[in-house]
A protein has these predicted regions:
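Beta-strand-turn-beta hairpins that frame and shape the catalytic cleft
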Residues: 1-4, 12, 107-111, 122-138, ...
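Short, flexible loop segments at the rims of nucleotide/cofactor-binding pockets, characterized by
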Residues: 25-31, 115-117, 142-146
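N-terminal, active-site-proximal structural segment of metallo-dependent hydrolase catalytic domains
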Residues: 1-74, 81-89, 244-252
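Charged helix-capping and loop-helix junction motifs
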Residues: 64-69, 150-156
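Structured beta-strand-rich core segments of catalytic domains in phosphoester-bond hydrolases
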Residues: 54-133, 225-228
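Active-site metal-binding loops of divalent metal-dependent hydrolases
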Residues: 7-8, 55, 141, 171-172, ...
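Metal-dependent phosphoester-hydrolase catalytic domains
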Residues: 110, 115-117, 130, 147-149, ...
């Protein structure tokens, strides 16, 4: 199976023009060509599971286009998405912001889906996708170190409580790379698919390892790469893996 993780920055693009006429102005402008390029890239990679971070689910920025559904339709995938700020956040009332989400797109048979929420941080959503033989979590962790550490504790409980092998993917915002989550991985029984610690941010000159695909016992990674495509400020991660026979029953 293949999982592709990509923080697509709401398909707003990159480059100097993103910060014109004022810094960050590009967040208010989605680009149809960028969305088309991202979609074609994902389609060419033919993943079984896609984890999208920073996806617009139909605000005025995109002309009411739900980016998760648009990409899923092109792939022939099932989609699941939710606002990343939590049900009680004031951000759910703010135009554009309330449509900022994370999403799973999946071709395998989906056995269940759940939304969990962190107790701290602005970005609180955890999406759980249950497949026949594994569970996949998608996250976008806080920019604040203290909040990230609290969020990792929540993730530890979810991972250890799973009765199936686990994949945990997302933008961890770890400014110190895998050093910051080393103890978490040890405690949760997870390994990083990115054994070479390849950086994923910023896409034009990658220096930081912010994005991760982690996996538990029962899963064997057969290939991992970070394609050098610059449709977003992050680079995507692609991981090929196999679930060992009987791993789900053993985990239970």
């Amino acid at each position: 199976m293949r999982i592709l993780l990509y923080n697509i920055r709401y398909a707003t693009g990159t480059g100097p023009a993103f910060h014109l006429p004022v810094p960050g102005a590009g967040y208010l402008r989605s680009n149809k060509q960028v969305l088309a390029d991202i979609t074609q890239f994902i389609k060419n990679e033919d993943p079984d599971i896609v984890g999208l971070v920073e996806v617009d689910t139909g605000s005025i920025r995109t002309g009411m286009v739900n980016q998760a559904e648009f990409i899923a339709a092109e792939l022939g995938h099932y989609s699941i998405y939710e606002c990343k700020y939590g049900t009680e956040s004031i951000n759910t009332l703010v135009p554009i912001v309330r449509k900022q989400a994370n999403a799973f797109l999946a071709s395998p048979r989906v056995h269940g889906e759940r939304f969990h929420y962190f107790d701290t941080g602005i970005k609180r959503l955890i999406i759980e996708l249950e497949l026949e033989e594994a569970v996949v979590f998608l996250v976008h962790l806080s920019l604040k170190y203290r909040h990230r550490q609290a969020q990792l504790r929540t993730l530890h409980e979810l991972v250890r409580g799973s009765s199936k092998p686990v994949l945990l993917a997302g933008d961890f915002n770890t400014f110190w790379g895998d050093h910051e989550i080393y103890l978490f991985m040890q405690a949760a029984g997870l390994k990083s698919a990115n054994t070479a610690s390849l950086p994923s941010y910023p896409s034009h000159n990658p220096r930081r390892e912010l994005d991760f695909i982690l996996y538990s016992a029962g899963i064997e990674v057969t290939n991992f790469r970070v394609p050098a495509v610059r449709f977003s400020d992050h680079l995507p991660l692609i991981c090929d893996f196999e679930i060992r026979a009987g791993a789900a029953s053993a985990a239970a």
